Amino acid sequence: MARLCRRVPCTLLLGLAVVLLKARLVPAAARAELSRSDLSLIQQQQQQQQQQQQQQKQLEEAEEERTEVPGATSTLTVPVSVFMLKVQVNDIISRQYLSQAVVEVFVNYTKTNSTVTKSNGAVLIKVPYKLGLSLTIIAYKDGYVLTPLPWKTRRMPIYSSVTLSLFPQSQANIWLFEDTVLITGKLADAKSQPSVQFSKALIKLPDNHHISNVTGYLTVLQQFLKVDNFLHTTGITLNKPGFENIELTPLAAICVKIYSGGKELKVNGSIQVSLPLLRLNDISAGDRIPAWTFDMNTGAWVNHGRGMVKEHNNHLIWTYDAPHLGYWIAAPLPGTRGSGINEDSKDITAYHTVFLTAILGGTIVIVIGFFAVLLCYCRDKCGTPQKRERNITKLEVLKRDQTTSTTHINHISTVKVALKAEDKSQLFNAKNSSYSPQKKEPSKAETEERVSMVKTRDDFKIYNEDVSFLSVNQNNYSRNPTQSLEPNVGSKQPKHINNNLSSSLGDAQDEKRYLTGNEEAYGRSHIPEQLMHIYSQPIAILQTSDLFSTPEQLHTAKSATLPRKGQLVYGQLMEPVNRENFTQTLPKMPIHSHAQPPDAREEDIILEGQQSLPSQASDWSRYSSSLLESVSVPGTLNEAVVMTPFSSELQGISEQTLLELSKGKPSPHPRAWFVSLDGKPVAQVRHSFIDLKKGKRTQSNDTSLDSGVDMNELHSSRKLEREKTFIKSMHQPKILYLEDLDLSSSESGTTVCSPEDPALRHILDGGSGVIMEHPGEESPGRKSTVEDFEANTSPTKRRGRPPLAKRDSKTNIWKKREERPLIPIN
């Protein structure tokens, strides 16, 4: 029993092992049978495909044969995806048709058609094509370089005809050595020759062939190096989904072949290829450029490694170790350094850049010129109204009454507008250097130049010789306004003048308050500081004709030009005006005499006193050598009329200017001033000669009414005793009767005055000197006149009416003046 128990497990184990072995053997056999069946199926499918291709070729050959036979028709229908393609092959140099040239068609880089040309160099091919696929046609022949033609269309063609021109190969120089073979091109420049070198052992000659029968061809593919080449180069790269085509720009291209007995020899191995490169800015020694070879199975250029750029004999060369002879090009990949750039393309880029730059520069110049013209036009247009306003103002000034009579029309606004348009610096054309007592008499040319400058000045033609006297004693005068008017030491009656002047300046503060209150009532603002020296004469020194008693005194004292018919009324509007560092009496608003009653003529106060100034050296005779007979200063006199309400002060300035211009050598006979209002010469001015030389003082007073000139007749009966001075000294309105002045006329056209005249010197010096009395020249009637002045200082006595005879005499005098005009007024 024990033995049986031991045998049962052993048998069981052996049975299991057998079962397992059988189970493994059955699947292996089945698998073998399955694998054998798959192989047979694949082989059967391949056989069927080959049979179909053979049948298709037979059909195509049959169709071609039928087309050659006239009148034959094809019974087979052409599929939609097939179109007819005719290829014409010729020689590019001789333009001859090439027969027996191989033509191949590649669709999507797969060869679909391969045929040869007939005797006419043409062949007709049915090409199966689908839209979106690439199409390449190549043609080649022995002795010619292969020519590819990539082509792609978006529409299905029905018929197409193309022509391919083949370049003939260039025979090369072959150098056979014991171990190497060197092939070079036949180029004139040896420095840039391409060369191919390989081992002699790589050449395998056929039987009965000698090495001397070997012929080499090395051709530089110039057609591939042109930018506008129709036969553009297309390269392909292999990736996961398939082939990817890229556009190439070759930098170097070569075709190397070896023939022996008319047959091409295959050389495979390490071949050293050296090609010259085009000079490019983005290519330098050390760069690696991809190498491309033409694949006859795909019909495209395929990348096969990289070559190195080196510099040899100052030239760049591309060296590459090729695996076989054939077609090789050096072309960088698109988007990398040196891709698609050569000298021609750079020249085109530079040309366009220069052209665009020139266009941009011209446009900028045109725009700048347009804006410049527009700016000038706008400036002229804006400046025309101001210029027209200034011209109208000057014409209005010229057309006004140019006599010395005063007008009370308020034109201060017109003057202000004109002054704003003019340069302020022209108004203060002070010649401090010329106003020097030590300076000698100037020349005649200088005097004429200064006079012409006065006449041609633009701003109101105000002759401003020197304003330096304003600042000489301004501090003293501002501290004591009566200091310049008080006499130094008077032996007789100095107190009358002092009392009179103190009474005239006593109410300065009251008048100043009245000035500020009535400033706006008369429609004018403060006077510009540039004109303060014109309107600031505190007193007017006028000389009467009854004081000229002897002819010896006449050349030293001539009357100034006086206002014409009418009197000036000075009321409380006349008060001193203090501005910064200029303080003198300024009458604000003279009122015409027609507004006053006749009783006001009794209110004239005439202070008679023989006054003289200390003799000081001055240069007032500078104009004596060049003064004309008829001094015409229409601009100066005109401004005295226009600048109302300060016409009386401007009249004093006109007199001062004429006195300055008329100083010169003394004349033996008394002369009068003739002022031409319109600039006419002296010969055209009508004047008359009145001989009034008598022994006694006459009551006649002849004056040129139109010219505004006072002419005093000299009297030989007695010497000049004193000058008659009019001083504004009362608070009540005072009237200066200019008719009371005894004036006369003479025939001469030039007035002779000298600086020794004390009254005139006082006027020209701006009133800064002191008034002195000469007791030696006092007349018998002087005391009585002064006593009358003291007696009439009270307001009640000043209101008395003048005698009737005196008024009649004044009326008769004016009648005489009006009946005898000297010149016509245009």
Curated annotation (Swiss-Prot):
Q: Glycosylated residues?
A: N108, N113, N213, N268
Keywords for this protein: Glycoprotein, Membrane, Phosphoprotein, Signal, Transmembrane, Transmembrane helix
Record-given protein name: Protein FAM171B
List every position bearing Phosphoserine: S794
Origin species, per record, is: Homo sapiens (Human)
Q: How does it sit in the membrane?
A: Single-pass type I membrane protein
Q: Any stretches that span the bilayer, and where are they?
A: 354-374
Name the domain of life.
Eukaryota
Any one cellular-component term (Gene Ontology): membrane
Q: Where is the composition biased (Basic and acidic residues)?
A: 438-448, 774-786, 805-826
Q: Which family does it belong to?
A: Belongs to the FAM171 family.
Query: Does this entry carry the keyword 4Fe-4S?
Result: no
Which ranges make up the Extracellular topological domains here?
Answer: 33-353
Its signal peptide is 1-32
Q: Which InterPro entries match?
A: FAM171 (IPR018890), FAM171_C (IPR049175), FAM171_N (IPR048530)
All ranges on the Cytoplasmic side of the membrane: 375-826
Instruction: Identify the stretch(es) annotated as Disordered.
Output: 52-71, 429-448, 474-493, 774-826
Q: Where is the composition biased (Polar residues)?
A: 474-486
Where in the cell? Cytoplasmic granule; Membrane
